[in-house]
């Protein structure tokens, strides 16, 4: 039996765990908004290290060993049809400060 892949779109939002929307982390606000819009799925991935050409975040943590806190990179991945993902773009444009937003297409296969 040949595997059959389908087409989908994804939206990735790169930000930091210290970036807030109102009083909650931005990544939680994005997931909450995506859920309220009925998007197919979302995942938050916490990185252990990263860099960008521009400094993001309010206070840059030098090291967890020295300062006791950390500012780890966070990636929010949303998957759905492109027209559905576009519903969250106004929210991101208004509220996703210090973020990089990437949209693309992918092939997917769901396994049991």
Report residues per predicted region.
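Positively charged, small/polar-rich N-terminal and surface patches that mediate targeting and assembly
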Residues: 1-112
